[in-house]
Amino acid sequence: MSLIIKSILNADAEARYFRPGELAQIKGFNASAASRLRLVQALTENRERIVKQSANQLFQKRPDIVSPGGNAYGQDMTATCLRDMDYYLRLITYSIVAGDSTPIQEIGVIGVREMYRSLGTPIEAVAESIRAMKYVATSMMSVEDRAEVDTYFDYLIGAMQ
């Protein structure tokens, strides 16, 4: 849940106006909006590169995934793997915009481990694909930008384990 929504809900639950500290937090959140949107734009514009390079890293590290019997064996299954990676990158962009991990949690994580287990997909391979995307994505960023983006990649990786 974004800082703004949390502040509204907290104030409303107590039937009060915003406190000065809450207003200062909202001001800071709004001041960082341009930076967050710039990061999301960069990730969005480079999504194909991020996903393809990350998939190549994953498949080199885990050749069992693309070998006969692997979950990404064959053109259709590889495309499904790339689609899932793109989906998780998109969730990360939602969270960056929100300034909060709630979109990852509410849209993408609930029940995902069980789903992958039921499909016979090794969840550690999914986590590894997200680690690879983190590496590729952050290699294109400044140290300051990495700190912002790392938070969401790390949250998603942790949720997959």
Curated annotation (Swiss-Prot):
PANTHER family: ALLOPHYCOCYANIN ALPHA CHAIN, PHYCOBILISOME 32.1 KDA LINKER POLYPEPTIDE, PHYCOCYANIN-ASSOCIATED, ROD 2-RELATED. The modification N4-methylasparagine is found at N71. Belongs to the phycobiliprotein family. Its main location: membrane. Keywords: Antenna complex, Bile pigment, Chromophore, Electron transport, Membrane, Methylation, Photosynthesis, Phycobilisome, Thylakoid, Transport. It is a peripheral membrane protein. SUPFAM superfamilies: Globin-like (SSF46458). The gene is apcA2. Contains one covalently linked phycocyanobilin chromophore. The chromophore is added by phycocyanobilin lyase CpcS 1. Heterohexamer of two alpha chains, one alpha-B chain and three beta chains. Pfam families: Phycobilisome (PF00502). Coiled coil: none annotated. One of its GO terms (biological process) is photosynthesis. The lineage of its organism: Bacteria, Bacillati, Cyanobacteriota, Cyanophyceae, Nostocales. This is Putative allophycocyanin subunit alpha 2. Light-harvesting photosynthetic bile pigment-protein from the phycobiliprotein complex. Allophycocyanin has a maximum absorption at approximately 650 to 653 nanometers. It is found in: Cellular thylakoid membrane. One of its GO terms (cellular component) is phycobilisome. (2R,3E)-phycocyanobilin binds at C81.
